[in-house]
Each structure stands twice: as structure tokens, then as C-alpha cells.
């Protein structure tokens, strides 16, 4: 699924793929937020994904293949809509280049498992570091929220001009506080 000997299109929407017309195509899915609470950030994150694969394709692609990300779907940072978009892409793509949001990606994890679909969430949830939790399907990038917090504490202890004796932690429910 999602891999063909036919060449990738020259562009997806208005974004060029940089695909080599003599190579086959690997299609990747993308589930974003264009109109929900991350609507201001989602398109920039998508641009980063598309730019990476444009670069990869112009550098030779992956073996005998170029890579194209299909048109992104607007999940509005809503888990049910996220699943709806995943269902619309699952038969067309080899993997998800981007799945925006921790609760959203967790909501579709069982479906990813059924399809043996690898995903790269735009989320830094610490649970993805455990293969028995993420079923070995999540490709992490960047430091997790937990590691970022520990790094901040290490920096503060080493860099601030005061002797830190106590540290308070305030947690919130949701994406970040549950980590």
C-alpha cells in the first residue's frame, strides 16, 4: 500500500515534490490542524515536512523511489476527525509523515497497529519511547516533553546565579500535563 512503480506527481497542491520521473513513488499521509487550536502552527509544520521530502527527492530519493505527501487533512485537533482522516488515507499511503497531536495519535494507535502503519507524530509524548506502548510504530524526533523539562532543570541549576534549593512542579491535564 502506498508504493507504486509509477512516478510521483510533480506537485501536491501547490507544493512541488521534486520527484524524479524515472523513479517510482512512495506516498505518505499527513493529518494536520488547519482550523482548530493549532491552526496557526499546523501549516508551518506541514511546510517543514514537505520541504524535507522535496530536499530528499532532489538528493536522489530513497533507492528507486521518490516520496510524495498526499493532501493533508484538517482534523481540527479533534481525535474523532483524526481517525476519519486516517481512514480516508490508510489505503493510499505507506506511512504517516505527520500526525499532529498526542491525544489524536494515541486515538488512532490501534488502527495504525491493524495496518502495521508507521507514523511520525508532531508530538513529543514520552510514552512513544516505549515500544511495548507505541507498538513499535512511532518514529520519534526531538526531545520528549519530559526530557525537555529535565533539560530545563539541569540548565537552571547550572546557569542561574542563585542556589536552587526547591523545585515546584505544576501539572495540567491534557497533552503536556499527562506526560
What are these regions (language model features)?
Residues 26, 65-70, 164-167:
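Residue-level recognition of the N-termini of beta-strands and the immediately preceding loop/turn
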Residues 52-62:
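Flexible, small-residue-rich helix->loop connector segments that border functional cores
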Residues 10-16, 93-179:
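Extracytoplasmic ligand/sensor domains, especially the bilobed periplasmic-binding protein
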Residues 42-43, 82-83, 109:
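Conserved strand-to-helix beginnings and helix N-cap segments that scaffold or border functional pockets
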Residues 9, 65-90, 148-151:
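Structural motif
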Residues 21-23, 62, 162-164:
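Short, flexible coil/linker segments at domain boundaries that flank nucleotide/cofactor-interacting
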Residues 3-4, 8-25, 29-50, 72-79, ...:
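Extracytoplasmic "Venus flytrap"
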Residues 23-25, 64, 91, 114:
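Extracytoplasmic
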Amino acid at each position: 500500500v502506498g508504493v507504486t512503480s509509477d512516478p510521483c506527481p510533480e506537485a501536491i497542491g501547490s507544493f512541488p515534490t521534486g520527484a524524479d520521473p524515472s523513479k517510482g513513488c512512495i506516498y505518505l499521509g499527513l493529518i494536520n490542524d488547519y482550523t482548530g487550536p493549532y491552526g496557526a502552527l499546523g501549516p508551518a509544520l506541514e511546510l517543514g515536512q514537505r520541504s524535507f521530502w522535496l530536499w530528499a527527492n532532489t538528493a536522489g530519493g530513497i533507492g528507486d523511489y521518490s516520496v510524495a505527501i498526499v493532501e493533508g487533512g484538517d482534523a481540527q485537533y479533534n481525535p474523532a476527525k483524526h481517525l476519519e482522516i486516517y481512514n480516508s488515507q490508510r489505503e493510499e499511503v505507506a506511512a504517516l509523515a505527520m500526525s499532529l497531536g498526542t491525544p489524536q495519535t494515541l486515538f488512532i494507535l490501534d488502527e495504525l497497529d491493524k495496518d502495521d502503519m508507521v507514523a511520525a507524530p508532531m508530538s513529543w509524548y514520552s510514552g512513544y519511547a516505549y515500544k511495548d506502548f507505541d507498538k513499535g510504530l512511532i518514529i520519534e524526533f526531538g526531545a520528549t516533553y519530559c526530557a525537555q523539562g529535565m533539560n530545563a532543570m539541569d540548565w537552571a541549576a547550572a546557569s542561574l546565579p542563585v542556589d536552587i534549593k526547591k523545585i515546584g512542579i505544576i501539572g495540567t491535564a491534557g497533552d503536556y500535563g499527562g506526560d
